Amino acid sequence: MGTNLSVPNPLGFFPDHQLDPAFGANSTNPDWDFNPIKDHWPQANQVGVGAFGPGHSPPHGGVLGWSPQAQGILTTVPTVPPTASTNRQSGRQPTPISPPLRDSHPQAMQWNSTALHQALQDPRVRGLYFPAGGSSSGTLNPVPNTASHISSISSRTGDPALNMENITSGFLGPLLVLQAGFFLLTRILTIPQSLDSWWTSLNFLGGSPVCLGQNSQYPTSNHSPTSCPPICPGYRWMCLRRFIIFLFILLLCLIFLLVLLDYQGMLPVCPLIPGSTTTSTGPCKTCTTPAQGNSMFPSCCCTKPTDGNCTCIPIPSSWAFAKYLWEWASVRFSWLSLLVPFVQWFVGLSPTVWLSVIWMMWYWGPSLYNIVSPFIPLLPIFFCLWVYI
């Protein structure tokens, strides 16, 4: 046993791996492995305890070597404490005892209460501790702080923390306004198309709108009259309808603004004098009739001056322009005055008015909604004008 040099053992996991020629074994140096506790071949057939537990490595040590730890033998070696240093000069020296105050600061011992009181009587010393008009009795006034504001700023150790709540609100406010404005803009741009569809649907009652330009000399594909391509003959009519719709929307906004300004009393229009069709706002020397009532704006002379005199009538604080239009229309069309008692009587019958409104909304509601729905995006704009003007 152990003399056959042809036993293959390239990895060295089996005992007597020093016999493998791959590891330099020969007849002159058969034992190049100096492992003192290596096992021979008969004992290699037994299950040994190695670094990985029973049966996982050969008895002679395994891949971790032949140390006691590789053989599964754990030995606890006590640690040796370091020796105490006997050289006291290498470490920190002890703090020496402070000498007495009379030895270290002899000049401080010469001041007693009597000497200090006498020194304070000197005007030069007194000026250092007491400001002008001060008293030596009681506590000493501190020296005023003459440090500049710049030095106080430079003495700070860091910048103050930023108020993130103010910064967030400052960013979210404009962002929400921008988002709401963009949403309203996209909705407003759909108004002309919706009104155009309603306008063209009046020509195709009971059927789907179809562009009539398809039967012309240059036919196009089937499309709606509200989305004609530029090559379609109906494209010019579509642009004309959109332009008229834009003018109508602009006129509607101006009317609403005019009504709002008139309600706020910002249109100082002189009312008409009953029985008179001529008015003048020229200069007047005196007024034959004093102005009555409280008004936001001053009174104006509304009758034609005679010898420099005129009749003064106060401008209404609200609905001045509407009253002027009503008086002007009543003078031009006398039959309008006959409608006033009927309107007052009808408005006074509140249950009847509400029942009539409910009946009309129930009967014409779907049709009115189809007509009014394109103008719904304008309601937020009207509301903002009403609130902020």
Curated annotation (Swiss-Prot):
Transmembrane segments: 171-191, 243-263, 338-358, 365-387
Applied value in biotechnology: Systematic vaccination of individuals at risk of exposure to the virus has been the main method of controlling the morbidity and mortality associated with hepatitis B. The first hepatitis B vaccine was manufactured by the purification and inactivation of HBsAg obtained from the plasma of chronic hepatitis B virus carriers. The vaccine is now produced by recombinant DNA techniques and expression of the S isoform in yeast cells. The pre-S region do not seem to induce strong enough antigenic response.
Keywords: Acetylation, Caveolin-mediated endocytosis of virus by host, Fusion of virus membrane with host endosomal membrane, Fusion of virus membrane with host membrane, Glycoprotein, Host-virus interaction, Lipoprotein, Membrane, Myristate, Transmembrane, Transmembrane helix, Viral attachment to host cell, Viral envelope protein, Viral penetration into host cytoplasm, Virion, Virus endocytosis by host, Virus entry into host cell
GO CC annotation, single: viral envelope
GO biological process, one term: caveolin-mediated endocytosis of virus by host cell
UniProt domain comment: The large envelope protein is synthesized with the pre-S region at the cytosolic side of the endoplasmic reticulum and, hence will be within the virion after budding. Therefore the pre-S region is not N-glycosylated. Later a post-translational translocation of N-terminal pre-S and TM1 domains occur in about 50% of proteins at the virion surface. These molecules change their topology by an unknown mechanism, resulting in exposure of pre-S region at virion surface.
Annotated family: Belongs to the orthohepadnavirus major surface antigen family.
Protein name: Large envelope protein
Species in which this protein is naturally found: Hepatitis B virus genotype A1 subtype adw2 (isolate South Africa/84/2001) (HBV-A)
